[in-house]
Amino acid sequence: MPQPERVADYPRPPELRASDDAVRVEIGGQVLCDTVAAGGTAGPLAIWKVCETFHPPTVYLPPQAMNLALLEPAAGRSFCEWKGLASYCDLVLPAVGEHPSRRLQRAVWQYLDPTPAFAPIAGWYALYPGLMDAVWLAGERVLPQPGGFYGGWITSQVVGPFKGDPQHPHLI
């Protein structure tokens, strides 16, 4: 197993890294993303990780692996000095078994026309792991980046401290 990466060593401006780590996201009794199923016999579809100083990686998921029927465009946008203008989607979940129907506002985002350095993630999706029922990366359950504002994915492969963690107010 590789040594964990220290997020303090990640670059600023952030770096885009390709990965073949499998991703599965479940919410409300549904699968929102499954890169293994989408990849079929060829193996999991590749993902992108954005790695930035003091942030766990934010993962960008290929549209082919997403259950797009659960997404609706949402009002509002935000701007990242590195990636550009982000558009949001609400996650609209129908009732399934014991899971009631619900809408999670702005739970997913994407950059439709990112800056040149981040062109590979154009149209790909990122999400807030803390809003999902379960998120797995390379078979490991993901923890959300603290604070609710950021969309980083914490696994045993990254070591903090992480921006947004109230235990490290100098990073907030």
Task: Annotate each PLM feature.
Residues 1-172:
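Terminal leader/tail segments of proteins
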